[in-house]
């Protein structure tokens, strides 16, 4: 893992820490969604930044708006080819969390899942890809209140998005040296100040070091049989996704392998995959070990 002082906003830990400032988070959401948001509440309940004792934690950003809308934002620096299914899962998790608290499904709020990608997830050269549910035959909107947005730092259609969004994505793509340059944008400047403040915070540095130790111990010791969630950068949604997270650190994971892992429902089999992934030094070795 990158040293604390060398982190940029594209790092999940740093991104989550910066976005815990409600003004930073609200500014991002308004820029991406292109409508005003009066007030938001950023959830830190399960964030390792505030609760480093947790395993199975989140390093994405979860926020609630004044109108009860829910927002989930995640930084992605590697193309794992599972983002569409991941977005579907995030929407369902938000809905289930709300329903579990007694809300009728008819009163479900609008949900927005946003991925900020340091790559082009679809290959069309867009800075922004927006997905809504529509009727295949008529093109009519379903209006189910769920929207998924993928941002890309590799966009080439500058005239189709705001200057602020382009500069923000340029900041996301910047390496440690370039990230301190002046992007001539007030919002980016506010993010740069937040990054500097976080890096000067000794407690935040200690929490990041603890995260490094947790991940290092997890890799070295393998997967404890009693653990069902695991930890990883970004939200890890159970054993199957943890296997894919581990494998992606070793190399490119084919759609065939990732689909087979996600389709596996046998807990014992998933545990075997986890153990194999934690010990493998390549995706090919994992494939041979598991027969996938």
Whereabouts are the PLM-identified features?
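Elongated, amphipathic alpha-helical interaction scaffolds
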Residues: 1-292
């Amino acid at each position: 893992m990158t040293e604390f002082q060398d982190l940029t906003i594209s790092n999940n830990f740093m991104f989550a820490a910066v976005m815990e400032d409600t003004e930073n988070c609200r500014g991002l959401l308004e820029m991406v969604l292109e409508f005003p948001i009066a007030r938001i509440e950023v959830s830190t309940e399960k964030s390792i930044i505030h609760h480093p004792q947790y395993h199975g934690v989140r390093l994405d950003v979860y926020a609630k708006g004044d109108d009860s809308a829910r927002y989930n934002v995640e930084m992605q620096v590697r193309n794992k080819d599972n983002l569409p299914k991941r977005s579907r899962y995030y929407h369902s998790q938000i809905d289930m969390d709300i329903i579990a608290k007694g809300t009728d499904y008819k009163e479900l709020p609008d949900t927005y899942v946003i991925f900020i990608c340091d790559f082009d997830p679809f290959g069309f050269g867009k800075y922004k890809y927006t997905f809504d549910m529509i009727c295949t035959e008529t093109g009519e909107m379903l209006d189910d209140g769920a929207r998924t947005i993928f941002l890309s730092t590799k966009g080439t259609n500058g005239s189709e998005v705001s200057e602020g969004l382009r500069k923000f994505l340029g900041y996301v793509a910047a390496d440690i040296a370039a990230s301190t340059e002046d992007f001539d944008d007030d919002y980016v400047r506010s993010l740069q100040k937040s990054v500097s403040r976080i890096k000067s915070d000794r407690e935040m540095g200690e929490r990041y070091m603890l995260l490094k130790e947790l991940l290092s111990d997890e890799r070295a010791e393998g997967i404890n049989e009693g653990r069902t969630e695991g930890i990883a950068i970004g939200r890890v949604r159970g054993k199957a996704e943890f296997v894919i997270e581990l494998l992606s650190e070793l190399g490119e994971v084919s759609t065939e392998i990732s689909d087979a892992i996600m389709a596996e429902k046998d807990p014992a089999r998933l545990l075997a995959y986890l153990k194999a992934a934690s010990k493998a030094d390549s995706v090919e070795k994992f494939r041979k070990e598991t027969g996938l």
